[in-house]
Amino acid sequence: MGLSDGEWHLVLNVWGKVETDLAGHGQEVLIRLFKSHPETLEKFDKFKHLKSEDDMRRSEDLRKHGNTVLTALGGILKKKGHHEAELKPLAQSHATKHKIPIKYLEFISEAIIHVLHSKHPAEFGADAQAAMKKALELFRNDIAAKYKELGFHG
């Protein structure tokens, strides 16, 4: 299930574009997630009061959390599948503290793909999208394995 060097190159090439504005990209990803899957908003006490897209766009906290999410994901992607050290604390917090189901990680993966395609169509064509989907699936599978080790079946 690993990615080839060429696939990692495609993933990290577009990720370089994301890193020019992590907070902005992250905010867009979270807005897309919450609009497409409103049930995910219930996992975020800090954001439950944000009922409209305008509210979400005005929220500095949402922007900051988007930055946090994409910073963590970028750190994992840059490890090219060798992300055990980065993944363990993330899985621990998402399983035991936040209780985030794997399904929600699928939802945010979809949101990431959508946002990257809309913001960077030239760098995120079919091959790059396929590579990113594969990288995100690798991440989710590894998180799911950690969840299982922790006894969380979300």
UniProtKB/Swiss-Prot annotation:
GO terms under biological process: removal of superoxide radicals
Binding residues for O2: 65
Annotated GO CC locations: extracellular exosome; sarcoplasm
Domain spans labelled Globin: 2-148
Residues recorded as bearing Phosphoserine in the entry: 4
Signal peptide from the UniProt entry: none
InterPro entries for this protein: Globin, Globin-like_sf, Myoglobin
Binding-site residues, heme b: 94
Cited function: Monomeric heme protein which primary function is to store oxygen and facilitate its diffusion within muscle tissues. Reversibly binds oxygen through a pentacoordinated heme iron and enables its timely and efficient release as needed during periods of heightened demand. Depending on the oxidative conditions of tissues and cells, and in addition to its ability to bind oxygen, it also has a nitrite reductase activity whereby it regulates the production of bioactive nitric oxide.
Family of this protein: Belongs to the globin family.
Subunit: Monomeric.
Protein name (database record): Myoglobin
